[in-house]
Amino acid sequence: MLKKSILPMSCGVLVMVMSGLLDAAEITLISHKTLGSQLRDGMKLATGRIACREPHDGFHIWINASQNGKVGHYIVQNNRETKHELKVKIGGGGWSSSLIEGQRGVYRQGEEKQAIFDIMSDGNQYSAPGEYIFSVSGECLISRG
């Protein structure tokens, strides 16, 4: 199932949410209102939910943007001026980075029908005016074997 939406955030971030085409994952995202342009490390910019209708063993989510050195950490460009960047990370309770080299995003094991995740500020930073657009993708993990 493919679900797209664009949600404006008061700090000038736009988010597009997508789920994988080959699985039964559904992703929703709700933006958090932020006051001002100063972002503290770990400040929640959005909270998302990935849901799987079919039997599964876990979840995998990632942001479709340039990675910022560590798995689950990203750099999003400002659409007005590309010299302005927003550093974000994806995760939350129960989510962990991939141990497989080259994999991006974070994983969570479990057979629950849904899991909650957060998009957060990665470090203390200033958010310049403009739009920061990125997409979040995800999939339901099924053991093969």
Curated annotation (Swiss-Prot):
InterPro entries: Adhesion_dom_sf, AfaD, Dr_adhesin_sf. It comes from the Bacteria. Gene3D superfamilies: Dr adhesin. It holds the Pfam family AfaD. Residues 1-24 form the signal peptide. Keywords: Plasmid, Signal. The keyword Signal applies. The keyword Transferase does not apply. To E.coli AfaD. This is Protein AggB. The lineage of its organism: Bacteria, Pseudomonadati, Pseudomonadota, Gammaproteobacteria, Enterobacterales.
